[in-house]
UniProtKB/Swiss-Prot annotation:
This is Uncharacterized sugar kinase YeiI. It is an enzyme of class 2 (transferase). GO terms for molecular function: kinase activity. It comes from the Bacteria. Pfam families: HTH_24, PfkB. Keywords: Kinase, Transferase. It comes from Escherichia coli (strain K12). InterPro entries: Carboh/pur_kinase_PfkB_CS, PfkB_dom, Ribokinase-like, WH-like_DNA-bd_sf, WH_DNA-bd_sf. Belongs to the carbohydrate kinase PfkB family. Its EC number is 2.7.1.-.
Length: 362
């Protein structure tokens, strides 16, 4: 913030109901300049909205994908090249967007930095994400471009047999485009990035975040390698076993290998590691601290798709709330369980209270 913005914030703290013309008189500037400064403070996340409600709660900035998710489920076990009966479902998606949505459901103040096209999908995604409680003022609309789309096909056993991720638009989320939100990021309590970002955008995040804890979702083994040289800048990492192999650089064939790989990443600077395992259990490891395995609580399962996004949101929420490492892991596992209990990518019943009610079962 510049000095003028700090002066305006100080005035608003003393009198949140003050009029813009009164602020202008106090600072001996025009009312239009006051309005412009207030708009800038809203964009930077220092003012939540109308009424000059100041943001005192630490907020999270999520930098990552927003896309339309199209998911088809065939009625057979082994889909072939022919047309098959089944169901097709479209929903707002994207790793970054899903995590931001879940954080809003948990009650946190969250900002999403991403890019959309100027098409129907883009407009729908922005509106749905805004309605969820996510601040989308940092999402940039690019004219003449199509919004990112994710297409997945599953069999009748709910196993994904093919997925296509058209996120080329994210290549245009450059540091130059992101610079408009640099002050917002610098004041965040936590920054979360997903590995759909370009190497240049990830570098921008890690460099600008500096001392702010950065959480990273590796997304897939095809994209995990982007952060291999940034491990010293990562506070919390949530890889799968194949993604952990990429980051470690060796095959993992046993629990001992997994533990060695985790410790190797700790030595490079990662503070917290949560390895998402195929059976939906999680191996949790804190640098110079605890290491343990958590299993999913007994809970209704409707669709596992997106549960890991619920898990990551739980990690961010519990970190901002000051939970211990073990309690943070337990809370995140509970969030993932609630996410699996819905056919939607973001279970509308996800809340901090509902997650805490499951924690004793974990």
């Amino acid at each position: 913030m510049n000095n003028r913005e700090k002066e305006i914030l100080a005035i608003l703290r003393r009198n949140p109901l003050i009029q813009q013309n009164e602020i202008a008189d106090m600072l001996q500037i025009s009312r239009s300049r006051v309005a412009a400064h207030i708009m800038d403070l809203m964009r930077k996340g220092r003012i939540k909205g109308k009424g000059y409600i100041l943001t005192e709660q630490e907020y999270c900035v999520v930098v990552g994908t927003i896309n339309m998710d199209i998911r088809g489920m065939a009625d057979i076990r082994y889909p072939q090249s022919a047309s098959h009966p089944g169901t097709i479902h479209c929903s707002a998606g994207g790793v970054g967007r899903n995590i931001a949505h879940n954080l809003a459901l948990l009650g946190r103040d969250v900002h999403l930095l991403s890019v959309i096209g100027d098409d129907f999908y883009g407009e729908m995604l922005l509106e749905e994400t805004r309605r969820a409680g996510v601040n989308v003022s940092g999402c940039v609309r690019l004219h003449g471009q199509s919004t990112s789309t994710y297409l997945a096909i599953a069999n009748r056993d709910d196993q994904t047999v093919l997925a296509i991720n058209d996120t080329h638009l994210l290549e245009q989320l450059t540091p130059q485009l992101l610079n408009g939100s640099r002050d917002l990021l610098r004041h965040a309590g936590v920054v979360l990035a997903d590995c759909n970002l370009t190497a240049e955008a990830l570098e921008w995040v890690f460099t600008l975040a500096d001392e702010i804890p950065v959480f990273v979702d590796t997304v897939s083994e095809f994209k995990a390698g982007k952060i291999k040289h940034w491990l010293a800048h990562i506070h919390t990492l949530k890889p799968t076993l194949p993604e952990l192999e990429i980051l470690w650089g060796q095959a993992i064939t046993s629990d001992a290998d997994r533990n060695t790989a985790v410790n190797a990443l700790h030595q490079q600077g990662v503070q917290q590691l949560f390895v998402y395992l195929p059976d939906e259990s999680v191996y949790c490891s804190e640098k110079d601290g605890e290491q343990f395995l958590l299993t999913a609580p007994a809970h209704t399962t409707v669709d596992s798709f997106g549960a890991d996004d619920g898990f990551m949101a739980g990690l961010v929420y519990s970190f901002l709330e000051g939970y211990s490492f073990r309690d943070s892991a337990r809370f995140a596992v509970a969030c993932a369980a609630i996410s699996r209990a819905s056919g939607s990518l973001n279970n509308p019943t996800l809340s901090a209270d509902n997650a805490l009610s499951l924690v004793p079962m974990v």
